[in-house]
Amino acid sequence: MSRETNFNGTKRKRSDVAEKVAQRWKSVRYSAEMENMAPVNSNNDSDDCVIVSESKIIDLTNQEQDLSERIETNDTAKGAVFKLMKSDFYEREDFMGEVEDMITLKDIFGTETLKRSILFSFQYELDFLLRQFHQNVENITIVGQKGTIMPIEARAMDATLAVILKKVKLIEITMPPFASHHTKLIINFYDNGECKIFLPSNNFTSMETNLPQQVCWCSPLLKIGKEGLPVPFKRSLIEYLNSYHLKDIDELITKSVEEVNFAPLSELEFVYSTPSKFQSSGLLSFYNKLEKLSAGTSASDTAKHYLCQTSSIGTSLSRARDENLWTHLMIPLFTGIMSPPAKDTAGRKKAEILPTNSLINEYSQRKIKPYIIFPTEQEFVTSPLKWSSSGWFHFQYLQKKSYYEMLRNKFKVFYKQDPAMVTRRRGTTPAHSKFYMHCATNSAGPCDASQVFKELEWCLYTSANLSQTAWGTVSRKPRNYEAGVLYHSRRLANTRKVTCRTFTRDRRGCAGNPTHVAVPFTLPVIPYDLAEDECFCLARHEND
């Protein structure tokens, strides 16, 4: 077994697979701004294993190499779908499972009909990423934060990579300390004029793609042309692109997106965060969308369930009090416990956050049940690759244990996967995805836990973790760029509910009634055993 250095310089053991992660990044130092300057209460919640220092892409060679292999996409679904990212570790050559539920980066980038690809992400490992492309691709536009793009090492460069690298256009985004260009978005254009959009939960590095569980939202094929009616998804996507205020994005990306007919996505909403001071985004924008769509839908005889599955939990909203973004701000806003944001005499939006005990009473009276899915220490122990995927999960609660104990012991908000329902190959491996969802059940009789979160009022799949950095608050703008897709029952035809299933056991819906959302964790989830379960925390293992 090898040993690795933790953030504070102490040593701990790591597995052989974790050693491979370290070898991949061993020549890259951590960003001094992000790691050394972050104060205790900074809400820096990067959910990624490392943040690399600024680098430049190396010069191209003139060598070329033809690829005879022709790769075809196998996704023929007419509507938007969720897929599980296939893993080189969990699904090996002998895998015979539900391949229709899975996708690879080769499926996304490797088709010979792909003409242009536009990528937004937080981390890029170029020698891994560019090998996923077919040689026929004409242009690859990469939008990334300075210091997060891993160049191709000289010893890894070959003729195939050199050919692809010549087609790359890099747009670098300068971000302030403790902020991230965290959006994960792919826009593909094909040689027949069609377009397709993907929202993966992973950044473009080998280990992040393969070690934690990852998912990908895939749009249907979109044609070039005009819509008969305005499409909110398109409008919000263009607003997001405009928020960069960069000529290269306007010329190379926005103009192309404007030519696409987004009518097939008319039932969905694009939800985003941007640090731009000129646009409303993040929590306030999401709240406004829900308010507009949810008007008149509340019922007094229902129990209301609100679930957040995340790979990172930010620090308390307040230094003086223990306040969590989900339990103390988002759910109270969504349910009307908290009054809508109002401006004071100085024009600033304000919100009065109730004390914890008052909120717990309100939740009880209004039949509101909050859930946060976050991996336990034991889930890593029982997962196939043990601690190897743990580097992508962050909740540094030892710095303020009262905050953690409030969530765990007072709200009893933490839930985990049901170990009896996980798959043999992936086991209790946690998911790096971020889902926010709401459903209602009849409160007159006993609640059937197996049916909770099968039919939803709404579901947001996003890159945004549970933090102020990603979402902002009522009075603060987000610091990150984030992107996601919102399903809402009021947008669906025939007043349907948003249907949800799990990849672990449920099969795809029949052709006439497909499921809208698929999640990489078990449904139902089960509550933490307060006598045994603790949230995973890296600091617990500093001296292992």
Swiss-Prot record:
Annotated segments matching region Interaction with DNA: 312-316
**One term of GO molecular function:** 3'-tyrosyl-DNA phosphodiesterase activity
Task: Give any Gene Ontology cellular component.
Answer: mitochondrion
Q: Which InterPro entries match?
A: Tdp1
Keyword list, A-Z: DNA damage, DNA repair, Exonuclease, Hydrolase, Nuclease, Nucleus, Repeat
Q: Where in the cell is it found?
A: Nucleus
One Pfam family name is Tyr-DNA_phospho
Q: Where does substrate bind?
A: 184, 434
Predominant location of this chain? nucleus
Q: Which PANTHER family match?
A: TYROSYL-DNA PHOSPHODIESTERASE 1 (PTHR12415:SF0)
- Record's miscellaneous remark: Present with 2130 molecules/cell in log phase SD medium.
Function recorded in the entry:
DNA repair enzyme that can remove a variety of covalent adducts from DNA through hydrolysis of a 3'-phosphodiester bond, giving rise to DNA with a free 3' phosphate. Catalyzes the hydrolysis of dead-end complexes between DNA and the topoisomerase I active site tyrosine residue. Hydrolyzes 3'-phosphoglycolates on protruding 3' ends on DNA double-strand breaks due to DNA damage by radiation and free radicals. Also cleaves 5' phosphotyrosyl adducts resulting from dead-end complexes between DNA and the active site tyrosine of topoisomerase II. Contributes to DNA repair after radiation damage.
Q: What is this protein called?
A: Tyrosyl-DNA phosphodiesterase 1
Q: Which source organism does the UniProt entry give?
A: Saccharomyces cerevisiae (strain ATCC 204508 / S288c) (Baker's yeast)
